[in-house]
From Swiss-Prot:
It comes from the Bacteria. Binds 1 Mg(2+) ion per subunit. Mg(2+) binds at residues 149, 178. GO terms for molecular function: 1-deoxy-D-xylulose-5-phosphate synthase activity; magnesium ion binding; thiamine pyrophosphate binding. HAMAP family: DXP_synth. It holds the Pfam family DXP_synthase_N. Its cofactor is Mg(2+); thiamine diphosphate. Transmembrane segments: none annotated. This is 1-deoxy-D-xylulose-5-phosphate synthase.
Length: 640
């Protein structure tokens, strides 16, 4: 291993950190930070968050006996230093690669990852579950949840904190405040106060005072309790957490190893109520290019360690995300009722561009998808035209609101479902696999999928005109095909697909961007003597029933293709054909969709090939339906 990390080279597991001095822990943190930077420069990934918690990670593994003591990282963006210290350093340069380490915590990967993560605000609830199980079994290990201040925008975190004191007396929550959105540290006095209020002497005096107070009449007793908590809250900023039943410590400098170790040891000794330790950290800490970047190099591709310069790909076609944003801006220029809503992802959804054009019509509600959906519903109910741009995977978090607050009331909220289908390096936690099924199940919903960037623009225009019911359109991560874009897109006719290529034997019906692979599959079929019709469905709801019945009459087989799970577009088509008797005449059908597994991270093309949704996979599906062996391209095949 590298001589640049002599101390880290001796660390095989967290147990090896427990005999280190404070000076050695500081050295170890510096080496872990260097290793994290070097590894992510090779793989790309989430850099800034991990750099901000290096000292905290080292201190946690030094003070607590992991994996016996449970440490749960919220989201998991910050877990790279944790992985380096927990026996995965030899694989750290496989982060987010096919067959490599996950970019998040993952139970199947290590005993030091007791709970998987990737979506925000789950850590405290999971930690409470571990506490309840521990208490029921009569065990005494510590349970720690590390959650960022951004995740506190999600209601689930407060639901868990509200239930904490009713669940257990032994829980540690560490608030990693890297935006100083709650309270900044106040120099040495802040660290001194944090250490003071977490120490045994202070708590003993406090306990004695409470004993005396209990002898007072009820009104005076309540007044004394409030006075003590608010007095402490004024100097520590923790009154809110105290009201939720936590003993608040902080804010402390999350890069001060001495303070971290001291306070964590004190917190470990608590046993009479949950503890919240407020650590203020700096995202991107210790790497100048990250500290100087507006986003603190939150997510990066491969980069030069010396300069921080990222190895951006040569300019290609605009991304689907950008196409969505640009068309939404065009529609908003002619309709002042159009507004846009994002849940803490303005850049990821392209709404940062919309926000520059229409700041007063752009709403970032934070990590709060449930609120985002019902907020949009309220705006729609009062005559506005809201577009809620939310990653498919995150829309899952607001599904009850989609059903109850939008669909049942028939409100015209427009859902722009970005990152639909497989997303590559972020793996199964971020894949947009299920939205076709869960959105298509809702009465009255108009559900579209773009085959290319021109189609996406037309779907934005279509959604803008739908005023009597909810609508949704899905589109993938990545670049479009480089097609010429119209000055302003024309809306589509609701529920009507299009024939892209006419054939006679097999009909391939694509929903989404698998259309290009479907056309390639048609070429492969032609080489085998089979003529294929290729259709872009455009709509999963309402289906183009006239088109589907025509295809059923005129072809021997129908193959549906979609970038989603089972129970989606193919299932809708199959049910519609069955209900109209189209299967009674021996029509052959195959529904090609994502496999019934959670696919691990890899390059998207490789993942779709594994799923059988590339041209070769579609070819195999068609040949299977026709009862033919998959022979060489030059052969005509034979009947099975």
């Amino acid at each position: 291993m590298s001589s640049k990390t002599p101390l880290l080279d001796t660390i095989a597991s967290p147990a090896d950190t427990r005999g280190l001095s404070l000076a050695e822990l500081k050295q170890l943190a510096a080496e872990v930070r260097a290793e994290t930077i070097d590894a992510v420069s090779v793989t790309g990934g989430h850099l800034g968050a991990g750099l901000g918690v290096v000292e905290l990670t080292v201190a946690l593994h030094h003070v607590f006996e992991t994996p016996k003591d449970i440490v749960i990282w919220d989201v998991g963006h910050q877990a790279y230093p944790h992985k380096i210290l927990t026996g995965r350093r030899d694989r750290i340069r496989t982060l987010r690669q096919g067959g490599g380490l996950s970019g998040f915590t993952k139970r199947a990967e290590s005993e030091y990852d007791p709970f998987g993560a990737a979506h925000a605000a789950t850590s405290i609830s999971a930690a409470l579950g571990f506490c309840a199980a521990r208490d029921a079994k009569g065990e005494d290990n510590s349970v720690i949840a590390v959650i960022g201040d951004g995740s506190l925008g999600a209601g689930m975190a407060y639901e868990a904190m509200n239930a904490a004191t009713d669940t257990t007396k032994r829980l540690i929550v560490i608030l990693n405040d890297n935006d100083m959105s709650i309270a900044p540290p106040v120099g040495g006095m802040s660290a001194y106060l944090a250490n003071l209020v977490s120490g045994g002497a202070y708590r003993s005096v406090r306990k004695l005072g409470k004993t005396v107070v209990e002898k007072l009449p009820t009104p005076m007793r309540e007044a004394a309790r409030k006075a003590e908590e608010y007095a402490r809250g004024m100097v520590t900023g923790g009154t809110f957490f105290e009201e939720l039943g936590f003993y608040y410590i902080g804010p402390i400098d999350g890069h001060d190893m001495d303070a971290l170790v001291s306070v964590l040891k004190n917190a470990k000794a608590f046993g009479d109520k949950p503890v919240l330790v407020h650590c203020v950290t700096q995202k991107g800490k210790g790497y100048a290019p990250a500290e100087g970047a507006a986003d603190k190099l939150h997510a990066v591709v491969k980069f030069d360690v010396v300069t921080g310069q990222q190895q951006k790909a040569a300019g290609g076609p605009p991304s689907y995300t950008k196409v969505f944003a640009q068309e939404l801006i065009k529609q908003a220029e002619k309709d002042d009722k159009i507004v846009a809503i994002t849940a803490a992802m303005p850049s990821g959804t392209g709404l940062d561009l919309f926000g520059k054009a229409f700041p007063e019509r752009t709403f970032d509600v934070g990590i709060a998808e449930q609120h985002a959906v019902t907020f949009a519903a309220g705006m729609a109910a009062d005559g506005m035209k809201p577009f809620a741009a939310i990653y498919s995977t995150f829309l899952q978090r607001g599904y009850d609101q989609v059903v109850h607050d939008v669909a049942i009331q028939g409100l015209p909220v427009r859902f722009a479902m970005d990152r639909a289908g497989l997303v590559g390096a972020d793996g199964p936690t971020h894949a947009g696999s299920f939205d076709i099924g869960f959105m298509g199940a809702l009465p009255g919903m108009v559900l579209m999928a773009a085959a290319d960037e021109v189609e996406l623009a037309r779907m934005v225009a279509t959604a803008a005109e739908i005023d009597d019911r909810p609508s949704a359109f899905r589109y993938p991560r990545g670049e479009g095909l480089g097609l010429d874009m119209p000055a302003i897109a024309e809306p589509l006719e609701i529920g009507k697909g299009r024939i892209v290529r006419e054939g006679t034997s097999v009909a391939i019906v694509s929903f989404g961007t698998r259309l290009s692979e479907s056309l390639k599959a048609a070429d492969l079929l032609a080489a085998r003597g089979l003529s294929a019709t290729v259709c872009d469905a455009r709509f999963a709801k309402p289906l183009d029933l006239d088109l589907l019945l025509r295809l059923a009459r005129e072809h021997e087989a129908i193959i549906t293709v979609e970038e989603g799970s089972m129970g989606g577009f193919g299932a809708f088509v199959l049910q519609a054909l069955a209900q109209h008797g189209a299967l009674d005449r021996g029509l052959k059908i195959r529904t090609l969709c994502l496999p019934d597994v959670f696919q691990d991270q890899d390059k998207p093309d490789a993942m779709y090939a594994q799923a059988g949704l590339d041209a070769e996979g579609i070819l195999r599906g068609a040949l299977s339906a026709m009862g033919m062996d998959n022979v060489s391209a030059a052969g005509a095949g034979r009947r099975a």
